[in-house]
Amino acid sequence: MAKQKFERTKPHVNVGTIGHVDHGKTTLTAAITSVLAGKGLATKRDYNQIDGAPEEKARGITINASHVEYETVNRHYAHVDCPGHADYVKNMITGAAQMDGAILVVSAADGPMPQTREHILLSRQVGVPKLVVFLNKADLVDDEELLDLVEMEVRELLSEYDFPGDDIPVIKGSALGALEGKPEWVAKVEELMDAVDAYIDTPLRATDKPFMMPVEDVFTITGRGTVATGRVDRGIVKVGDQVEIVGITDTKTTTVTGVEMFRKLLDQAEAGDNIGALLRGVDREGVERGQVLSKPGTVKPHAKFTAQIYVLSKEEGGRHTAFFSNYRPQFYFRTTDITGIITLGEGTEMVMPGDNAEVTVELIHPIALEEGTKFSIREGGRTVASGSVVKILAD
């Protein structure tokens, strides 16, 4: 049978491996590519290719991450694997690699460890919707009861962080065994990918979500009106659509009377397009950078929220000293800086460079916010921390 030509007709899903250091995340990533390559669905990547992760920058923070891609019969996957623990923390908080789901790797020989817990917590905080568990190194555990005990421990830990611990698929296997081509362990990696296929939901395509566009610039066209420019974050906007202008000032409703891209007029624009939207009855002062245009009723302005933040270390160009409650930096959301006040959680005296922490933030004026919205914290124009909105609080 001729090999099928690669077509982008399959739904695309972003996943990643998470878990404690040395529990086998990278070996499993290599094993997945190796097993799927045997079916003509991936290019085999060996451990060293994945482990030598290149540096990338996201929101002014350097992160090491390896990206591999592969397919199952049903889907096309992009898979991210990070070499160091700090890279995971940064990756998840900055959203450098959005994950629609993750494979939690736990060594059956060691059971859950501190970073296992931390990665589950981070997944919960930054909104990774679904986890699948791979109990690795099962070939090193002779006692079946011990394996069951570790599985129970992992399930309890997941439930502790509000994941459905009883329902999450747990596959016991050996990544190294699969990489070496041993049939019983190859079968376990196949079982894992079946679970990932079935349990991790296909994300809504960006174009199927309600329209939103952060405003980057505003200008006036004489005789025609005010144009707001920016990149459509999600959804579709058509000429004649009503939109709301949200954030900074009171929410206003207007109608899009024209959509322009590369100086050409369009009937509609969709997620990813850089456009200018002509707004009816809005003067030059009626819309500004930092606001968003959105489908009416879908986005609300908020000023107060809890957030998970990662504070850059001195070596990363961050602060040299700790900060305390009532710290007042600038919060950079989408296109604009806005001052806010940080309050630390009970029992936390201070936050040191290199830490990650949960904090409460109150902005000086409300802006369009949702759970999962990413932001940077800046001081004098340089990034000192990165964060993700965990929960909106009543103002």
From Swiss-Prot:
Gene field: tuf
Region (G1): 19-26
Annotated Gene Ontology cellular component terms: cytosol
Entry function: GTP hydrolase that promotes the GTP-dependent binding of aminoacyl-tRNA to the A-site of ribosomes during protein biosynthesis.
Pfam families: GTP_EFTU, GTP_EFTU_D2, GTP_EFTU_D3
Subunit-level organization: Monomer.
Location of region: G4: 136-139
PROSITE patterns in UniProt: G_TR_1, G_TR_2
Family per similarity comment: Belongs to the TRAFAC class translation factor GTPase superfamily. Classic translation factor GTPase family. EF-Tu/EF-1A subfamily.
Protein name listed in UniProt: Elongation factor Tu
Region (G3): 81-84
Binding site for GTP: 19-26, 81-85, 136-139
UniProt entry keywords in alphabetical sequence: Cytoplasm, Elongation factor, GTP-binding, Hydrolase, Magnesium, Metal-binding, Nucleotide-binding, Protein biosynthesis
